[in-house]
Amino acid sequence: MKAYDIIVSPMLTEKTNTQRESINVYVFKVNKRANKKEVGAAIKELFNVTPVSCNLLNIKSKAKVVVSRRGYPIGKGKTSSWKKAYVYLKKEDKIDIF
């Protein structure tokens, strides 16, 4: 896989912003088939920084019920499962897109 196929998007939330500022951790949504080595290599190639470590989390899908305007359930479905990567960088390194 290429680097652009591995890194899907950055995660920008209040929690990830505080982690980025305090302990220099960046959070990304990544391809479900990617492993730690591939994610680290993609970060190094795309952003020119060297990751110290990388943790991956599999986020399971959740069941959802589609409700009509009157409040009656009209269908069932589920969200997609996806993978999240926590990338730890050195204190002097920084990714500029954030």
Swiss-Prot record:
InterPro entries: Nucleotide-bd_a/b_plait_sf (IPR012677), Ribosomal_uL23-like (IPR013025), Ribosomal_uL23/eL15/eS24_sf (IPR012678)
A Pfam family assignment: Ribosomal_L23
One cellular component (GO) term of this entry: ribonucleoprotein complex
Gene3D superfamilies: 3.30.70.330
Membrane-crossing segments per the record: none
Keywords of the record: Ribonucleoprotein, Ribosomal protein, RNA-binding, rRNA-binding
One term of GO molecular function: rRNA binding
GO biological process, one term: translation
Superkingdom of source: Bacteria
Family: Belongs to the universal ribosomal protein uL23 family.
Quaternary context: Part of the 50S ribosomal subunit. Contacts protein L29, and trigger factor when it is bound to the ribosome.
Function: One of the early assembly proteins it binds 23S rRNA. One of the proteins that surrounds the polypeptide exit tunnel on the outside of the ribosome. Forms the main docking site for trigger factor binding to the ribosome.
UniProt protein name: Large ribosomal subunit protein uL23
Originating organism: Borrelia garinii subsp. bavariensis (strain ATCC BAA-2496 / DSM 23469 / PBi) (Borreliella bavariensis)
